[in-house]
């Protein structure tokens, strides 16, 4: 199966103290990730504080990372919104950028469309680009989710709708997707670091990861071990990552991971409101988990 890679990091974005985008530091983070276990990057996703970024800043960051880092791995641009018209317009702009390998498109949030509305939303986007599309299913943030049957219909009509970041937390959904879309031309990625190993067992090919900012090599090694039939080694790595994964989600993402990135020396910069630094107790918890992990 040709995939975007095993470990795709949903990367943080670096901002200056005044809240403006720091492209140089963001590119440095991207290079670090690709040199330390990541096969590709998701740029300007939730972890990258996409809601607080302007369209112009997103386009500038997509362009810079594709140009400076695209030779090292897959570059996937997050382009989704809950308005179909503006999503289509943005997709057309992003599709013109050299070096973008795929698009991440979330199920429309807050307005909670039914399955027909979701189908028509993704249909309009698919007709606006030839780039591979990864659907992002995350009911906990969106308020609803795409059904495997809707996804299968989209893929049958638009083969470049060819991947999903599956973050429902329900292994049966991933299993049903693989049943309805058999073969190697559709990629299922875990959208939850802690469920990556069990997701592999029902047909996933990798993970869109947050913890890979600090544990990218181990995440990649775990997937490679599973693929090679070394299940006990994969389980050992999975268990060794449990505490650091838990620490990355003790409060809302990307608060823990951006704090952790600073602690390991990455130029992560400040948060843009409404995101803010972790509490003292949360920071202490993350510090302990990092110290234990790097031993």
At which residue positions do the language-model features occur?
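Active-site beta->alpha loop and helix N-cap motifs at the rims of alpha/beta catalytic domains
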Residues: 2-9, 14-143
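C-terminal alpha-helical cap/extension of soluble enzyme domains
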Residues: 7-13, 32, 36-38, 93, ...
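Hydrophobic side chains within alpha-helical segments
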Residues: 19, 60-61, 168-169, 195-196, ...
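Basic, gly/Ser/Thr/Pro-rich low-complexity segments located predominantly at protein N termini
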Residues: 24, 50-53, 85, 168, ...
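A general structural signal for well-ordered alpha-helical segments in protein cores
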Residues: 26, 58, 62, 87, ...
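Short secondary-structure transition/capping segments
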Residues: 53-56, 89, 115-117, 146-148, ...
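Short helix-capping segments at alpha-helix termini
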Residues: 67-73, 97-99, 129-131, 156-160, ...
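Catalytic alpha/beta core domains of metabolic enzymes, predominantly
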Residues: 127-128, 141-249
